[in-house]
Amino acid sequence: MVRVRADLQCFNPRDYQVELLDKATKKNTIVQLGTGSGKTFIAVLLLKEYGVQLFAPLDQGGKRAFFVVEKVNLVEQQAIHIEVHTSFKVGQVHGQTSSGLWDSKEQCDQFMKRHHVVVITAQCLLDLIRHAYLKIEDMCVLIFDECHHALGSQHPYRSIMVDYKLLKKDKPVPRVLGLTASLIKAKVAPEKLMEQLKKLESAMDSVIETASDLVSLSKYGAKPYEVVIICKDFEIGCLGIPNFDTVIEIFDETVAFVNTTTEFHPDLDLDPRRPIKDSLKTTRAVFRQLGPWAAWRTAQVWEKELGKIIKSQVLPDKTLRFLNMAKTSMITIKRLLEPEMKKIKSIEALRPYVPQRVIRLFEILETFNPEFQKERMKLEKAEHLSAIIFVDQRYIAYSLLLMMRHIKSWEPKFKFVNPDYVVGASGRNLASSDSQGLHKRQTEVLRRFHRNEINCLIATSVLEEGVDVKQCNLVIKFDRPLDMRSYVQSKGRARRAGSRYVITVEEKDTAACDSDLKDFQQIEKILLSRHRTVNNPIEDDSDRFEEFDVDSQMEPYVVEKTGATLKMSTAIALINRYCSKLPSDIFTRLVPHNQIIPIEENGVTKYCAELLLPINSPIKHAIVLKNPMPNKKTAQMAVALEACRQLHLEGELDDNLLPKGRESIAKLLEHIDEEPDEYAPGIAAKVGSSKRKQLYDKKIARALNESFVEADKECFIYAFELERFREAELTLNPKRRKFEDPFNYEYCFGFLSAKEIPKIPPFPVFLRQGNMKVRLIVAPKKTTVTAAQLQEIQLFHNYLFTQVLQMCKTGNLEFDGTSNAPLNTLIVPLNKRKDDMSYTINMKYVSEVVANMENMPRIPKDEVRRQYKFNAEDYKDAIVMPWYRNLEQPVFYYVAEILPEWRPSSKFPDTHFETFNEYFIKKYKLEIYDQNQSLLDVDFTSTRLNLLQPRIQNQPRRSRTVSNSSTSNIPQASASDSKESNTSVPHSSQRQILVPELMDIHPISATLWNVIAALPSIFYRVNQLLLTDELRETILVKAFGKEKTKLDDNVEWNSLAYATEYEEKQTIIVKKIQQLRDLNQKSIEDQERETRENDKIDDGEELFNIGVWDPEEAVRIGVEISSRDDRMDGEDQDTVGLTQGLHDGNISDEDDELPFVMHDYTARLTSNRNGIGAWSGSESIVPSGWGDWDGPEPDNSPMPFQILGGPGGLNVQALMADVGRVFDPSTASSSLSQTVQESTVSPPKQLTKEEEQFKKLQNDLLKQAKERLEALEMSEDMEKPRRLEDTVNLEDYGDDQENQEDENTPTNFPKTIDEEIEELSIGARKKQEIDDNAAKTDVLERENCEVLPVAINEKSRSFSFEKESKAINGRLIRQRSEEYVSHIDSDIGLGVSPCLLLTALTTSNAADGMSLERFETIGDSFLKFATTDYLYHTLLDQHEGKLSFARSKEVSNCNLYRLGKKLGIPQLIVANKFDAHDSWLPPCYIPTCDFKAPNTDDAEEKDNEIERILDGQVIEEKPENKTGWDIGGDVSKSTTDGIETITFPKQARVGNDDISPLPYNLLTQQHISDKSIADAVEALIGVHLLTLGPNPTLKVMNWMGLKVIQKDQKSDVPSPLLRFIDTPTNPNASLNFLNNLWQQFQFTQLEEKIGYRFKERAYLVQAFTHASYINNRVTGCYQRLEFLGDAVLDYMITRYLFEDSRQYSPGVLTDLRSALVNNTIFASLAVKFEFQKHFIAMCPGLYHMIEKFVKLCSERNFDTNFNAEMYMVTTEEEIDEGQEEDIEVPKAMGDIFESVAGAIYLDSGRNLDTTWQVIFHMMRGTIELCCANPPRSPIRELMEFEQSKVRFSKMERILESGKVRVTVEVVNNMRFTGMGRNYRIAKATAAKRALKYLHQIEQQRRQSPSLTTV
């Protein structure tokens, strides 16, 4: 027989508030909840549930709701609350209203017509009813606040309810909800209580519901074994403590003195008495309660604390004297107790000095010692201790911990106890930093308790209240429970089966304790008997089902494949587990919803059950039990078993019958995550990351590889036609040389090819003569060459590369004239004819060069020289070589100018030599014979072979190119002395003068030489463009099935063009956020003028501006913090949100380290309450999350001053900063967007004179100083619970004269669960009928969707961009005649231009003129969008968790890398800078060694593993062998307390990440990271999208292997309306229900706001339905739509930014995108358009959070300040430490904004145009604002702010939660931490915190530089 544990047999309970709401809709209910906002939550949601009746017009069955309050001041408060959360019009009525309501019934009717809900005082309502202005039957809901007043016989509540009951017999009456605080007083006799509850129920005609957190604890918590231990009284006076009287006397006298002193004037002095009183009070209390030993220890701690306060401040003398007095008292007490106490070193020695309660406590703990359990208790398996000890006061908790730690160190038998303590903050100021510090510490301690690192927790009541703690097996209430709440809460902590709940009580309190406990237990029974969870019974009324075998009732479910078996008895637990694994936010606990249906069979009642799973589960329909069961419990189990069966068939449970939850997904994601930690140094590289690099072969274009020319066979001649499009920059031509355009030369270079070569676009190269456009032109006629000619050509070709270009100096290349060379074309000089552009090979020239090539330079014989006659013609356009110098490495010069006035006899510029003649004789022993020759002014031939970018200007030249001015006629051979000249001689005067007679003239002319220098760059580019052309053809054939891929003869590609330095100045490419900010300052006319000028760039050529992100040094904003460092040294600056007084919280036995977390006075005296002290180090870092000002600003005061304390007393700088902020009207945000509402707060009046300001300032200072000292309150002795329970004593409200009618009223309290089930279902049915009548049925179907005028009137932005996006300046030129070709989708022309493909394959590492980054951004966004669209439409019943997982897998870098590698993309990628000498293989050359490095061994294996993971196979976990290689050498890694810490090394100055670990062959291989391949795939998507449009791009993505919807695939979108509730009798049930929801939540109103009318209204309802709203079974929740909408918004916004006329560089684009596409922005917009009023949810936590957020947004006027911390750029919501639950922005609000976008997209038939119109209407202001005042990434900003002084020093991964904490160090001594889901987010958070602090310091400095002292 199976006995089932009670907690496994019931479904997880719903939130008690939801439970209450459910009852309140179905029957009249009185709800009793504490003062929190729990009550209002239920009231507002009840009103929403009745929305259908309330919104219907009164003449069509509509009704009204009344919220009745006691006092006038509550009317407005409740009305505002209802208005924030609903779209009801709320009227307010009380005695003072002058609404004319009383004048006539017509007036009253008009008022009722205008308002749906009326908040009214009781008396007014009664009067209106009595005067027949209102009828009770016209109301649908009647809510009474503080309904216990109905017990008073004369109270209006009572009178209204009397009328109500009279009507009830024959008219429909409204639903009544009574709200009251707790009715259970701490000290009320149970019998009395019962009687009073019945009276109230009768008066209100309602049932009191007792569901609350307390009752759910009692009901669902395990029942522990309760024990009371009676101990001897502790009489401290009788212990014979030496010096006892003296000690007591010191206490009394000091306290008396402090209390009676009149020294401190309340308005003028800093009063230190609070901390002094606390120190005395706590020490004395410890002395009285725990004895002298504990008091001795406490006195030591206080002595230290007071000492700190004394040291910490510059305090007035009087204050100091007082503090010193207190410190002396502590020292005296310590000294008096020390002699005896110091001796104690064992528990026995301690025994006489402590109460028996403490000794008993240790005896109980000892029973958990494993050895004790084995030996004395004879237990086989030891039970591990997991205990909580509750005490009332914080300092008792602290002293008890000290005692435990010492006893543990004295007594080995207590070694197994690992204690710690948690206390709550004092409850006064929860925002203060010390409570945040405490909160953080509390989180940490509880986490360690969860993981059993701590097994004994000493706690104050903070833990009694809802802080989630794991189940314990021992709870000790050290101080007896004094009220019901304390009893139930503490008992509820003992949740483990067989746990013990122990109360220790002294003899004197025994009687009181006994009677209290009896009462508590009685009351608990009463409450439980009244709290029926009808559909989820724990005990069954009918019979105890444990008597028989449950599992025999129904066959177990068995999975054939694995043999996994599920029995009936365990099914419920599995359903609970499954629900908890569904995706939901932190506020929502998803639980199943079940209903029990009694059925009569042959006079016997049996039970059926139906189960509804949460609405985001794929199973949306109700799971119904076919065969009834004998009792309710078995019915529940059976329906759960059926549900599990269906879940398994749906694939929601795996074959082992376990939920496929987040864990398994997370495991898989680990392999493919977007490498969150990839930038963290020292973490092993994953597949797809930027860290993992591999080697790939470089590819040569097919056309160039197959172009080998054979003798006597026809071949093509290709000419390189150079045409200058811009003169050389003046900076690059300082001597103002004149250059001719190569286009006008009569000769040029080309090459021979056996095969025809495809057309490629022209491209630029940057020569000495200027910027050239290179065209590859084929000669009209083919040619043949003979074998002899071919040999000569090969020699010429070899000569160019070896001698002229010096390519073979390193000996790594050899010439290969056969077809073996990878690139085998031959270079030839060509003659060209201008008229018909025909080209012929200039063989004469070839022969001439070949004849002279061996012996250059030729040294002439002496007699030849004597004959030498100078002929100027020979030297024009010549290259000369001095033959008298180093012949091994000849130097070549261009002859720039012939100087006729210079002769060899001219004066030599250097003082050492008279003339040139003398110089040559002395230096070279050479005599110059021709004395009449002119000298030559020459320039160096450039050795720069990378001409793809213009030469960098203004850099000091290398030593060999500049001559020393003293010998400016001779080129320097030695570099040593030329260096000084660089700086002293202006460029233009540096001339190099040579003597013609001593030169040899090279056969190659200067102009051709120039072109030869360009050949490596030209060939390199031609090869690239041919490769990308091959890719274009492949895509046309394979993706589009095209046959024609060649360009027609009359068509050519547009030129490759990219912004170079000069052009960037001419056009707007926004590279830096700062630049954008500056640009925005310029007037718009300026911009327009500039744009007009840009359009006129010469040659009519449009420039293609892909922002080349130029990492030039960012300007540092100097913040020199070091000047103040001495002030900060006092404390450890580990600024992580803890205040200075709280140390690290790891208490050890050394007293020095004890953190006495009573209160941190130090911080309080240094800093203000809600401002930021300039130097209060850690205090400043506390994240408030919302700009500067915490509290609401005082209404009337124009000066929200804060008092800022600093180490020198008051911080006047900051004060002045504040004054500035208030008085300077210019700081008010200029209203940039017209949509922002005007501020409702009027600006402060200008104050007259500065003196007045100062007067006021002084008064304020004093006043606030006083307030601050008052706020230094230490917590009370008894720590108050955070949530004070208000209780109502019903006796106070009853009258003596009982009204007669009460006697006759039957009690409303149902007798059995069955009766209650019946009552509830009748209530629900009635409401439904009235709803259906009230709902208008004429809006069932709509024909079309439409965009409303409000959205069209926006400067309508269509989302269809021209096919060739302006952002890429369309690249396909057709012949000029054909201006524009229409862009219908089928017309993809010839695909994407090779230029664009090349850009998409060029990484930023290549330092080329273009890079893929911009395209990658848009491609990434489109990829996410297309994948999301596909998944949404194919995985129709998967919830958002699975969709997100599938998307992550698809768009992960790891998957893109894998696909890219399969397509051969790596061989096409340009990943490194072009270096002609080292890494380029010239035509007809092969490497001398054929070495080829392999990839690392495991690369292949890792790739295969990822392949399997992405295909969804299960991966065996391999044990990782730690080799020490997977982590960088300098990184230290350690794991302690479940936190893995990686400390990053200090970065060395030089570090090159790109260096391959192994040598490889640079000529044939390149080293590329996996991420670069993924990026290139995204960029290719981007460039196709921009050129061809979305549909063709989807085809390309499909070819790549990505899963996307094809245009021609018709994706059937099923209707969003789910029809599970339709029945044959009511075929339109679901439509009617949808209709009701539509009315109830007023979606027509919402449509007007957003400017779009839905055709399929179910989409909109779904978009607003939260997972917690179980009632909506007709559309499901918004999670899937949110998943879709997120991607739609991301793509649309990214595309919009991309197309902006200010071409944003990739970095700016990414920053703007992150700033606009994030939860905070979306949530703010949702609130701006009042989405929360239509939000369909039942989730208390979320409800309160939304309320806070709405308030915050309205205070800000819905102004999106992107630089406020809340809007700072981060990719996802990051988490502040210890505040996971405190994320200020309710994610659900952002989610519904996204789901609305998804809904519009689907409803409009997946039309982005329509969607963008509506979204742009809503977002326009925000987008424009963001571009006008762009935010920047916090990490980037921090690096620029403190460039050299920022270091991210360590990363900690909290193993349990997987969260990451990162520490950043700024200026060496300030540390900030950030926390997040992964390294990237955590790093951003840390940077944010650091920035926040630095900005504050900077601001204070800037605003008050002159103020340094008060």
UniProtKB/Swiss-Prot annotation:
InterPro entries: Dicer_dimer_sf, Dicer_dimerisation_dom, DICER_DSRM, Dicer_PBD, Dicer_platform, dsRBD_dom, Helicase/UvrB_N, Helicase_ATP-bd. Residues 845-1003 form the PAZ domain. Residues 1833-1896 form the DRBM domain. Residues 1381-1589, 1643-1805 form the RNase III domain. Residues 571-667 form the Dicer dsRNA-binding fold domain. SMART domains: DEXDc, HELICc, PAZ, RIBOc. The record marks K1787 as: Important for activity. Its EC number is 3.1.26.-, 3.1.21.-. GO terms for molecular function: ATP binding; deoxyribonuclease I activity; DNA binding; helicase activity; metal ion binding; ribonuclease III activity; RNA binding. Disruption phenotype: RNAi-mediated knockdown in a cps-6 mutant background reduces the number of DNA breaks in embryonic cells undergoing apoptosis. Keywords: Apoptosis, ATP-binding, Coiled coil, Endonuclease, Helicase, Hydrolase, Magnesium, Manganese, Metal-binding, Nuclease, Nucleotide-binding, Repeat, RNA-binding, RNA-mediated gene silencing. A motif (DEAH box) lies at residues 145-148. Residues 1272-1286 have a biased composition (Basic and acidic residues). One of its GO terms (biological process) is defense response to Gram-positive bacterium. Component of the ERI/DICER complex which is involved in processing amplified double-stranded RNA (dsRNA) intermediates during small-RNA-mediated gene-silencing or RNA interference (RNAi). Involved in cleaving dsRNA in the RNAi pathway. It produces 21 to 23 bp dsRNAs (siRNAs) which target the selective destruction of homologous RNAs. Seems to process the precursor of the small temporal RNA let-7 which is involved in developmental timing. Required for avoidance behavior induced by small RNAs derived from pathogenic bacteria such as P.aeruginosa. The avoidance behavior is transgenerationally inherited, and thus progeny display this same aversion despite never been exposed to this pathogenic bacteria. Belongs to the helicase family. Dicer subfamily. This is Endoribonuclease dcr-1. The lineage of its organism: Eukaryota, Metazoa, Ecdysozoa, Nematoda, Chromadorea.
